[in-house]
């Protein structure tokens, strides 16, 4: 943070006719609350969306923005394969924070075609099939929402996986049309996240008490032993480097990684 406790003014970034404020050069020195405040004040609440999967990180961020005068739009994606505990949590979150969480859904015709061609559990077949499922059920609905804004807030943390260890607190997302990607908890540890949740007595997914560190679609999430990489509970039949849905890492890159490590991956049981 610059002298005086305020961020350095952002210049304007221009690409393909779109004008967007550049990221403050001292952003990595900001705390989580400051990251959110700078994003809201620079872009405006109507041009910023908080994307939540209702994971622990999202709960912390919702609490951080709940006492701000201006709040971003909040969205979540119902993929059609979420566990019941996640649906229950959504109602608890709405009640606790008094916010309108907009539920995005995949195109029914796209889901129907995919299931007809490859079956309901195609994600076990290959990385490409799994990415197709993630893209139709999760990525595309959120991508449509991101096309309407200048920035999105995520719960990404560097320690979550090998694909996220370089996550900046504020970055530019070119995959979704040149927008800010706001990661206020990038440098937080899992312990810090859970300490915050328990200290503030915030709601969370009860599956976390059953050994699920990461909760996504029901068939693609599982409980794991303590001390294991958090993302190993997601898409565990794939190599660690490919365990992303395509929202935060380009799908083509994930697919290439998956194919290059195919000989290291055990078939799904």
Give residue ranges: language-model regions.
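Nucleotide-activated chemistry modules centered on ATP-dependent adenylation/adenylyltransferase
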Residues: 2-269
